[in-house]
Amino acid sequence: MLKILLPTLMLIPSTWLTNKKWLWPSLTSQSLIISLLSLMWFFNQSETTHFSNYLMTIDQISTPLLILTCWLLPLMLIASQNHLSNEPISRQRTFITMLVFLQLSLIMAFSATELILFYIMFEITLIPTLIIITRWGNQAERLNAGTYFLFYTLAGSLPLLVALLSLYSSTGTLSLNLLQLLPNHIPMTWANYSWWLACLLAFMVKMPLYGTHLWLPKAHVEAPIAGSMVLAAILLKLGGYGIIRISITLSPSMKELAYPFLILSLWGIIMTSSICLRQTDLKSMIAYSSVSHMGLVISAGNNQTPMKALTGAMILNTSDGLTHSALCCLAKYQSYERTHSRALLLSRGLETILPLMGTWWLISNLANMALPPSPNWMGEITIMTALFNWSSWTIILTDLGTLLTASYSLYMFLMTQRGMTPEHLNAINPTHTREHTLMTMHLIPIIPLMMKPELIWGLFF
């Protein structure tokens, strides 16, 4: 564990001591080495925890998300280099420091064995993300987006703190290893109902559940490219990971309380997918697409057949992080660096001008619509099977959601790549090796995940 934490921590002094000429190449190379080192976590075949100590441990649930977190830092640095090239060097160093601090917080959150440590790291991720959005966002609306992000997250998280303190007063521990050994039968009282709701509310807001999702489109649209990538790839998945972890403390006798969340998440898949079909803003469409996919993960987390549903949630969490991060990069290269507009109608027919970029769009959209045998398809079909076993009526909503997902994914591709090129796009800059390298590093990991999906399906299969 220290092989990853200490080099990541040393990136902060390296950021401030490296010569400005070598700042971006040096930090990108170091972070890439750290991400390659993190792959060693895949090669532990133990079904229990490993690299363990009193406060932090790694198991098959946290391993995929930890590796995804480490893999994302060099990608964010590559994506942000051109965007920040005109900034003063001190601001560039501050930006990189925020990204490194965010990665450290996420690593500690995903590996925490104490629930209070997990809560602290869960909240600390808010600080660098908020700074990135409000300082390096592109428009004045970024301040409004930051306010939404701050208050939604805090309003959902404070009840979780009260619930954890209540759990500690009744059990005497917040260690996940010890909580698994306690009897999980809890009396059906209104106080315990409230405790159960408080445990899940923070993660529902973070994912987000339909109805608590209004902060995400604003934050996603106004954030710079690195902020959009980390939101889509990691921070939303932190909510799904929290649901999986906290579920061991929740009583099965309260399964009726999960029904409203489950129904609302399935209904949210339909609603957000329908909203995507009516969007004219490219980044907003990608944000609502994230909400739609997270609806399936929420329904899996609240399902009573964990052996299948949680496996699907783990697969979809990881693969969706890569796919949506890739879509954010493509939107950035198209919207901000070439057409200077997020409007779909003003950026049509780019496939004839940038054919290789059109190929990346096609692959990313096919992965987003869960085309077999992509990992997204494996996750979705596993969750849909588990939901069908729980109630056959859910197949109506999940099938309709799948149809709408395919529809808006194809709509996104056709609106950006096909048709007549607008007359104002008469001087488009060619693509660069940096951009193709970034897209390759996003989409190449999908291939081994297709060939060996057990790497990311956790302990539940």
Curated annotation (Swiss-Prot):
Whether NAD counts among this entry's keywords is yes
Would you indicate the residue range of the signal peptide? Answer: none
One BP annotation, GO: electron transport coupled proton transport
Catalytic activity from the UniProt record: a ubiquinone + NADH + 5 H(+)(in) = a ubiquinol + NAD(+) + 4 H(+)(out)
Q: Where in the cell is it found?
A: Mitochondrion membrane
**What keyword terms does UniProt attach to this protein?**
Electron transport, Membrane, Mitochondrion, NAD, Respiratory chain, Translocase, Transmembrane, Transmembrane helix, Transport, Ubiquinone
What Gene Ontology terms describe where this protein resides (cellular component)?
A: mitochondrial membrane; respiratory chain complex I
Q: What is the enzyme's class at the highest EC level? A: translocase
Taking the record's annotation, the residue ranges forming a coiled coil are: none
Pfam families cross-referenced by the UniProt entry = Oxidored_q5_N, Proton_antipo_M
- Its EC number(s): 7.1.1.2
Give membrane topology per the record. Multi-pass membrane protein
Recall the GO molecular function terms of this protein's record.
Answer: NADH dehydrogenase (ubiquinone) activity; ubiquinone binding
**Top-rank taxon, per record:** Eukaryota
Membrane-crossing segments per the record? 23-43, 58-78, 92-112, 113-133, 148-168, 196-216, 224-244, 257-277, 353-373, 395-415
Q: Which NCBIfam families match?
A: NDH_I_M
This chain's function reads:
Core subunit of the mitochondrial membrane respiratory chain NADH dehydrogenase (Complex I) that is believed to belong to the minimal assembly required for catalysis. Complex I functions in the transfer of electrons from NADH to the respiratory chain. The immediate electron acceptor for the enzyme is believed to be ubiquinone.
As for family, the record states: Belongs to the complex I subunit 4 family.
Spell out the protein name for this chain: NADH-ubiquinone oxidoreductase chain 4
The organism of origin for this protein:
Xenopus laevis
